[in-house]
């Protein structure tokens, strides 16, 4: 069982790491540079939902046309809880990796506690596992990552943020 972690907005604000679309794209391309030396890969498997965007970028850059998903729910808003496999990797993709994942690339945005990574590793133990960001608890479970952040950091991904109007600092300047 995974312990429940409640991160309200006030707690997250002190350890916030906002990532812009531009920065995320650069980080995904940097990840691809590293992965290019490891491949080739027969398929990319995105861990949804966070792994969808980096998987698309990595697959494009590496020229991989077969993209699959494994859908695992681990967060409900800002609370991490029990893992639930909503959709497994397709049999045709598993077959490309000989059933163990050899030659397959698993991509996610972040490895946090490692719970999701551990579950996916059990499904495809020989696959190469890559994330854009890694926290210390989960880092040993991934093969390739770009940026490590502290365990108490909350990453705000660009798809979680919205552009809003910011009033001028000086009253009446607008």
Curated annotation (Swiss-Prot):
This is Xanthine-guanine phosphoribosyltransferase. It catalyses: GMP + diphosphate = guanine + 5-phospho-alpha-D-ribose 1-diphosphate; XMP + diphosphate = xanthine + 5-phospho-alpha-D-ribose 1-diphosphate; IMP + diphosphate = hypoxanthine + 5-phospho-alpha-D-ribose 1-diphosphate. The lineage of its organism: Bacteria, Pseudomonadati, Pseudomonadota, Alphaproteobacteria, Hyphomicrobiales. Its EC number is 2.4.2.-, 2.4.2.22. It is a peripheral membrane protein. GMP binds at residues 112-116, 154-155. Belongs to the purine/pyrimidine phosphoribosyltransferase family. XGPT subfamily. HAMAP family: XGPRT (MF_01903). Mg(2+) binds at residue 109.
């Amino acid at each position: 069982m995974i312990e429940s972690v409640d991160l309200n907005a006030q707690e997250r604000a002190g350890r916030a790491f906002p990532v812009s679309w531009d920065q995320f794209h650069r980080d995904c391309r940097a990840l691809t540079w590293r992965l290019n030396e490891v491949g080739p890969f027969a398929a990319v498997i995105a861990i949804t939902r966070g792994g969808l965007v980096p998987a698309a970028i990595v697959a494009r850059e590496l020229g991989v046309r077969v993209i699959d998903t494994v859908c695992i729910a681990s967060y409900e808003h800002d609370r991490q809880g029990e893992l639930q496999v909503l959709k497994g990797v397709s049999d045709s993709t598993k077959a490309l990796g000989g059933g163990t994942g050899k030659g397959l690339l698993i991509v996610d945005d972040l490895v946090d506690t490692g719970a999701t990574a551990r579950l996916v590793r059990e499904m495809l133990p020989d696959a190469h596992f890559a994330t854009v960001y890694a926290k210390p608890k989960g880092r040993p479970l991934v093969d390739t990552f770009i940026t490590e952040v502290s365990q108490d950091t909350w990453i705000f991904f660009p798809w979680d943020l919205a552009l809003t109007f910011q009033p001028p600092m000086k009253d009446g300047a607008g």
